[in-house]
């Protein structure tokens, strides 16, 4: 585990200056995701004892300290590059002693909370428009898998 402050900025390639210059780092983002995962697990009655969910949530972007952050649009446009990056991320994380095992359900929970945090950060910066609406639609689809739409709404309401 590293203890220095992160210089890994999130949103660094985003065309919206409110996000690009918003000051969000992985050191701020990862604890928020862990908090959301903890809350979602409690809402769902999902046991955390024996689970690596919070470890993964708290450290899921640590490889970016070594590799940098690959923007989501680049991952979407070049899936083969995204897969190579994912392999490199896993290798770097293992080298840091961060090797967790998640169930498929926990992977989905982590993904939902990661996207939800990004959406809430964008909302907090006043971002509107199609990209925000698309993110909200994705979050709704994901939250429906867990019957957690009310939970998502409560999290977003607490963030307003």
Where are these regions (language model features)?
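Short active-site segment of divalent metal-dependent hydrolases/proteases
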Residues: 59, 63-64, 117
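Active-site flanking loop/helix segments enriched in acidic
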Residues: 2-29
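Divalent metal-dependent phosphate-bond-processing catalytic cores, especially two-metal-ion Mg2+/Mn2+ enzymes
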Residues: 102-160
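Post-HEXXH active-site segment of zinc metalloproteases
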Residues: 70-87
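Histidine- and acidic-residue-rich, metal-dependent catalytic cores
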Residues: 37, 86-100
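Active-site-flanking alpha-helical
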Residues: 63, 67-68, 121
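Alpha-helical phosphate/pyrophosphate-handling elements in metalloenzyme active cores
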Residues: 19-53
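Alpha-helical scaffolds flanking conserved acidic
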Residues: 46-59, 104-112
């Amino acid at each position: 585990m590293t203890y220095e402050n992160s210089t890994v900025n999130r949103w660094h390639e985003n065309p919206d200056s409110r996000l690009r210059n918003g000051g969000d780092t992985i050191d701020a983002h990862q604890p928020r995701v862990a908090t959301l995962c903890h809350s979602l697990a409690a809402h769902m009655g999902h046991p955390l004892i024996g689970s690596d969910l919070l470890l993964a949530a708290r450290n899921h972007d640590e490889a970016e300290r070594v590799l940098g952050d690959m923007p989501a649009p680049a991952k979407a446009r070049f899936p083969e590059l995204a897969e190579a990056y994912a392999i490199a991320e896993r290798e770097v994380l293992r080298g840091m002693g961060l090797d967790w095992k998640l169930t498929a359900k926990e992977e989905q929970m982590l993904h939902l909370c990661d996207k939800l945090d990004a959406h809430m950060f964008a909302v907090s910066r006043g971002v509107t428009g199609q990209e925000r609406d698309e993110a909200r639609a994705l979050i709704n689809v994901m939250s429906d898998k867990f019957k957690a739409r009310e939970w998502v709404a409560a999290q977003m309401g607490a963030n307003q």
